[in-house]
């Protein structure tokens, strides 16, 4: 059964989220840039993943600002704005402390959230974290090598 969608206010923007499961531990399942609440329930492997997490506690999943059922925005949100959105959702859900579970592109914002609010983070699970952005020196070096080939 697909859980009801709730909305938390982060400034002037409504952030859509769902709660799955219950238990003593809250888990914020933060998807990367792509993915939304609606498509989550259309992907059997992802549903199994969420249901597995829900056996451990209450899972909070959100649509990032400008995606899915959350309000549209004109600009790409910064890590700090996205962090504030996570805080708005956890506050609205009554979560004082949670494990943050995420991967790839969302690991930066999860790490920033944990560093900013250590008292609110019980744990940090980072799957396939990205240590470099697209403008990293490594990418510059690769571009240079490719440009030198004749």
What is each of the regions a protein language model found here?
Residues 80-98:
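Conserved acidic catalytic loop of the alpha/beta-hydrolase fold
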Residues 1-6:
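Short, hydrophobic/aromatic-rich segments at coil-to-beta transitions
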Residues 7-71:
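Conserved HGGG/HGGXW glycine-rich cap/lid loop of the alpha/beta-hydrolase fold
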Residues 102-110:
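Gly/Ala-rich beta-loop-alpha elbow adjacent to hydrolase catalytic centers
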Residues 40-42, 73, 135-140:
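Short aromatic-enriched loop/helix-cap "lid" or pocket-rim segments at secondary-structure transitions
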Residues 111, 115-116, 120-150:
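Flexible "cap/lid" loop of the alpha/beta hydrolase fold
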Residues 58, 97-99, 121-123:
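Structural signature of beta-strand start/N-cap positions in the alpha/beta core
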Residues 82, 100-103, 127:
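Short beta-strand immediately N-terminal to the catalytic nucleophile in serine-hydrolase-like folds
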């Amino acid at each position: 059964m697909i859980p009801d969608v709730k909305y938390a206010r982060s400034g002037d923007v409504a952030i859509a989220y769902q709660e799955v499961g219950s238990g003593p531990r809250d888990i914020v399942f933060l998807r990367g840039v792509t993915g939304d609440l609606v498509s989550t329930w259309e992907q059997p492997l992802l549903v199994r993943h969420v249901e597995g997490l829900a056996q451990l506690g209450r899972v909070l999943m959100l649509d990032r600002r400008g995606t899915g059922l959350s309000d549209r925005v004109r600009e790409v949100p910064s890590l700090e704005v996205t962090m504030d959105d996570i805080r708005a959702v956890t506050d609205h859900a009554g979560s004082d402390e949670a494990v943050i579970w995420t991967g790839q592109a969302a690991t930066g914002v999860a790490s920033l959230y944990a560093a900013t609010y250590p008292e609110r983070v019980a744990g940090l699970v980072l799957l396939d974290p990205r240590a470099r952005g697209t403008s990293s020196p490594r990418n510059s070096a690769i571009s240079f090598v490719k440009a030198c080939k004749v």
